[in-house]
Amino acid sequence: MRYLSKDILEEVITQRPSDSYKSNFGRVVLIGGNRQYGGAIIMSTEACINSGAGLTTVITDVKNHGPLHARCPEAMVVGFEETVLLTNVVEQADVILIGPGLGLDATAQQILKMVLAQHQKQQWLIIDGSAITLFSQGNFSLTYPEKVVFTPHQMEWQRLSHLPIEQQTLANNQRQQAKLGSTIVLKSHRTTIFHAGEPFQNTGGNPGMATGGTGDTLAGIIAGFLAQFKPTIETIAGAVYLHSLIGDDLAKTDYVVLPTKISQALPTYMKKYAQPHTAPDSELLEQKRSR
C-alpha cells in the first residue's frame, strides 16, 4: 500500500510552459445533471475548470443551461436532446466524465450507452455517481477498460463489484478490480485507489466533507488533472489527495466543508505545489498534442 502525502502533488503538478494555449490542457466533456440534480454537474464543472482543464463542455438538461452559465461562464453547454452535437463533442474529447446528477431514467441509459459505444482508446472515461449504478444494472461492457476510472462510494461499489460492504476488504477489492480491468477510486473516510499495481490510500479527509457534492467535486478534479497532466495513476492519486488536503485545511475553521469552497481554492493550492518542468516548453507542448 502506498500512502499519499504532499509529495504526490509535487510529482504531478507542473508549471505551465510560457507559450501555452488552452488546447494544450485538454478538452473535457462532463455529462450529467437532470432536471432534479443540476447542482451535481455544476459542482463537477466548477472543479474541472478550477483544476485547470483547457476547454470544458457540459452536456446536461436544458433546465441547467442558465444556472450553469451563471456559475461557470467558462464552460460551453450542450443539451441532452442535441443528439448530433452531443455525439460530435464526445468524439473530440480527451477526457469524458459521466454521471454526476445524471439520474437513472431512459434518457440517462441512452446517453451512457452512446458514450460507452463511442469511447476511443486515446480517451479517459470517468464513470461516477448514477452512471455507476446504471452500468451495474445494465448489460454494458467496456471497450478499453484500462482507460476507465470508476469513482464509487461503498454502496455503489457493492452494486458494481457484488461485494457487500462488510466484505470489501483490501484483497477482495483488488480481485474485483482485476476482473474489471479499470481504475477504482473507492471513496470512504480513507479513500483507496485500486489499479493494476500497488494500491494508493489517501491519508486526508475529515467528517466536515461528508456533505452533498463532495464526490461530484472530486470527479471534476480528476477530470481536470487527467486532461492536462501526464495520464497516469499518480495523476489520479494527486487529484484525490489535493481534494482532501484543501478540505482538511478548510475544516480547521469551518464546521462543514462546502465542496464549492474546495473548488475555489484549487488554483491557489496548485500554484503552491507546481514544480518547474525539465523539458523545453516546445517539447512539453508537443507531448500534450500527441497524447
From Swiss-Prot:
Q: Name the keywords, alphabetized.
A: ATP-binding, Lyase, NAD, NADP, Nucleotide-binding
**Which residues take part in binding AMP?**
215
* Pfam families xrefs: Carb_kinase (PF01256)
Q: What is its EC number?
A: 4.2.1.136
Q: Name one GO molecular function term.
A: ADP-dependent NAD(P)H-hydrate dehydratase activity
Question: Catalytic activity, per the record?
Answer: (6S)-NADHX + ADP = AMP + phosphate + NADH + H(+); (6S)-NADPHX + ADP = AMP + phosphate + NADPH + H(+)
Looking at the record, the residues that make up the YjeF C-terminal domain are 5-273
Q: Which residues form the signal peptide?
A: none
Which of the seven top EC classes does this enzyme belong to? lyase
Reported cofactor(s)? Mg(2+)
InterPro entries per record: Carbohydrate_kinase_pred_CS, CARKD, Ribokinase-like
Binding residues annotated for (6S)-NADPHX, in chain numbering? 40, 103, 153, 216
Q: Name one GO biological process term.
A: nicotinamide nucleotide metabolic process
Function field: Catalyzes the dehydration of the S-form of NAD(P)HX at the expense of ADP, which is converted to AMP. Together with NAD(P)HX epimerase, which catalyzes the epimerization of the S- and R-forms, the enzyme allows the repair of both epimers of NAD(P)HX, a damaged form of NAD(P)H that is a result of enzymatic or heat-dependent hydration.
Which family does the similarity line name?
Belongs to the NnrD/CARKD family.
Q: How does it assemble?
A: Homotetramer.
UniProt protein name: ADP-dependent (S)-NAD(P)H-hydrate dehydratase
